[in-house]
Amino acid sequence: MRKTFPLLLTALVLAATTPCRAQDAPASIDLSKFPAAEVEDIVVPVPSEVFLVLDKLGTPNWRAEVRKSLGKNTGNRPQVALLLGTVIAEGFIAVEAEDAEKVKEIGREVLALAGVINVRKAVITRSKSITEKAEAKNWKAVRVEFDGALQDVRGAMEELGDYDLAQLVSMGGWIRGTEVLTSIVSKNYSQDGAELLHQPELLDYFTRKLDAIKNTRLGKDELVVRIRKMLAAIKPLIGKEDGSKISIDQVKKINAMTSETVGAITSKGA
């Protein structure tokens, strides 16, 4: 049985983005109408739709959510993979903020990080296109290019047999996306906004992937261990199977945990 649930930016790391128009944003959240993509037995809405719902629920200050520093890679492959995920997530946030200079900076950083994990060739064209489309302020096209860059990176990593690292890219993007979602919702709380966090199946999915890591050294990596603990701590807050409402206090707790983890990923060794 397939599961459908809401989530900011998860599709960024797991599925293709569908460009959409602001006037198409619904007045309230109807998950059954979200364009979605399937990962194994999990169906997720595309990020543009979730962003538009947030815009409809309030007026997020996207520029305030963009990180000034993208972080520094340590050369440690797990950290670089997680960092790459956060940087690509940052790209979508910068697009929502319509910050052309930040988008171009992120495009360059994606290329640099891809080089560290030996998949630079997979994103050279995308990086150039991100810069060109950002200069033209063609935000829909930039969204598509960021999603394409992620898919190219993941595909190249899997071709190299780096399946576990590819999952870490996904998790890095999800963690950063969840940090931003909880930040926005906590500043203008509503039950509809908080409902975007209800995602027990995804937490189980990521936990299974971490538990299935075969490389002992990777499985014991400090950041991987930290993320495993974070998922376990978040599950009772956003993984309620009974559909219980997620309170503003829970949203703030999730934000604190994801923010600390993003900080560990982006500043480790910096």
Model feature map: region roles:
Residues 1-8:
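Bacterial N-terminal signal peptides that target proteins for export
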Residues 69, 78-90, 110-117, 121, ...:
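Long, amphipathic, charge-rich alpha-helical segments that form helical bundles/coiled-coils
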Residues 18-22:
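Sec/Tat signal peptide C-region and signal peptidase I cleavage site
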Residues 23-130:
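N-terminal Sec/ER secretory leader and immediately downstream segment
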